[in-house]
Amino acid sequence: MTTQPRKILVTCALPYANGAIHLGHMLEHIQADIWVRFQRMRGNKIHFVCADDAHGTPIMLNADKLGITPEELIAKAKADHMRDFAGFNISFDNYHSTHSEENKQLTAEIYNKLKANGFIKSKVISQLFDPEKNMFLPDRFVKGTCPKCKAEDQYGDNCEVCASTYSPMDLINPRSAVSGTTPIVKESEHFFFDLPAFEGMLKEWTRSGSLQSEIANKMQEWFESGLQQWDISRDTPYFGFEIPGVKDKFFYVWLDAPIGYMASFKNLCNREGIDFNEFWAEGSDAELYHFIGKDIVYFHSLFWPAMLEGSGYRKPTNVFAHGYVTVDGAKMSKSRGTFIQASTYLNHIDPECLRYYYAAKLNDRIEDLDFNLEDFVQRVNTDIVNKLVNLASRNAGFIAKRFEGKLADKLEDEALFAEFTAQAEQIAAYYESREYNKAIREIMALTDKANKYIDEKAPWVIAKEEGKEAELQAVCSMGIELFRVLMSYLKPVLPKLAERAETFLQAELRWDNIHQPLLGHTLAPFKALFSRLEKKQIDAVVEETKALFAAANKAAEKTEAKPTALSTVEPIAETITIDDFAKLDMRVAKVLKCEAVPESNKLLRFELDLGDHTRQVFSSIKAAYNKPEELEGRFVIMVANLAPRKMKFGVSEGMILSAGTGGSDLFLLSADSGVTAGMQVK
């Protein structure tokens, strides 16, 4: 009985059109591409789409800063993103943009259906308004004095000092973080999606067993804390789609972004005559999978299925979330040269190396993946060059020189061949469940067996003995056959190497012909299939990344605003004695690690080296240093004998010194070169 091909639609999360693609993005796109290529090899009907996420305030503000239109900015971003994905052999059937006619129409349609079904609510809310910029100010764009503890320079929703929450309008002396002006209060009608109405459906979907256990458990926590109505509107000025029938109101970017999956597929359907409803209509028997990062699970497991349910469309079959990429055990860092852009990598290294390395470490769980640069070189060279490609090269020479490229008419070891091909379904199961690490482990175990077979048969010895031509041809043909099976298994991971192998073998590598040996088949002349990865290539990537970071920093310094005539110098504090000053023990400290406190809008957490011990210090300088990882490796000045202070997020064991008026106007104090951690400031 013939099994009907599955109908599958796969998407990746939409990269934001306000920055370059980096190796963190590539984890997800490589993971999805391997799965898609595997499904194609299995004969399934699969479509793979993505798009740029092209709306929102950051794009509007960045375009204004660059002196171009948002449309020009997102057009360049899309071209850059498509180039990078193509460079890594990501086989999208379509790559689109959320700023498209298809997305505009689908967004309006879904909104109107939700509204007609009673799932859109409206209410008038009061917001602070910047009269100079003529824009409403979200919480993070307002600063002022905490109404509870009177701490200065606090954000508009919560105080980092006393942990109080409040409305932006409760702030004392509020100011716009955009222009610095004093905001006024204005009322505005906003539109809300009634997410709580879908709680029953979402709970049932969670219990279906199709979601990753980590996602299902997290959703249960969200249910327990209570679902809230979701504000889906933003006031002008805003770069996005206007809400139908409402003046100066726009859809929040997270409403139209996931609809971009549908829009990209719609664009493909219109171009190739595919039935859109066959994949998206309620009750569709097609499979729909979203590959995403763990940071956007909330939107994809709550808002998105609820929106689809409320507008009469089908829900995803599953949402596959993955973790983040770290480099050498730490967050990616521009200053250390490890925040690697895709284009920088492609300037120096074969993309198949990264595809293989990620595959060797990826599993079906939401775990961070460490990109260890030393291990990267060793694993690629050991597995691909020394084991896999060498298996072909060490046998191809004999077949070409002694037998005019023709393979033997029968298998030298049928049992060994059967052992290799018998693993096809197990390896397929690993690919299907996204346990690529297990698939690679199994394939490499077989590769070791193949090389052991050749080592034991020693064709280089047989070649020197008279009358053993048939044996030599049989052994080397067996080695080539095993290489063919292994390359078939690795084709989803290494598509370009597979293409070169197919040229050499003069045969297509398919899953359904793995069991069919190339008996009596003629090979093409052997050419080098893969180059060894050198450490100097890694060094070049790191140095180019550092140079890009330094150039960007230099450009930013040139464009920084000069202090205005209105700037004032704080008055000198009350006089103290030398004895008072002597009580302070100030030390030079080296930043080992610096990261944002997720629950805080203001704090950075530092891990500091003081020479003979380390300390944890929290500092309210997040607004001034929005890329904290770039501070790692710097020397700072700290007050070391300040009493430890227990805060909401942990114990702070000292104070880091900085200068400025507060907020984004803060500058860390540093020491001249030559200092070491722990030195006392005198």
Swiss-Prot record:
The reaction(s) this protein catalyses: tRNA(Met) + L-methionine + ATP = L-methionyl-tRNA(Met) + AMP + diphosphate
Chain sites annotated for binding Zn(2+): C146, C149, C159, C162
Amino-acid positions noted as binding ATP in the UniProt annotation, renumbered to this chain: K334
SUPFAM superfamilies the UniProt entry points to: Anticodon-binding domain of a subclass of class I aminoacyl-tRNA synthetases, Methionyl-tRNA synthetase (MetRS), Zn-domain, Nucleic acid-binding proteins, Nucleotidylyl transferase
Protein location: Cytoplasm
A family per Pfam: Anticodon_3
GO cellular component: cytosol
Record GO terms (molecular function): ATP binding; metal ion binding; methionine-tRNA ligase activity; tRNA binding
Record's function text: Is required not only for elongation of protein synthesis but also for the initiation of all mRNA translation through initiator tRNA(fMet) aminoacylation.
Family membership noted in the UniProt record: Belongs to the class-I aminoacyl-tRNA synthetase family. MetG type 1 subfamily.
Protein name in the entry: Methionine--tRNA ligase
Gene that this polypeptide is encoded by: metG
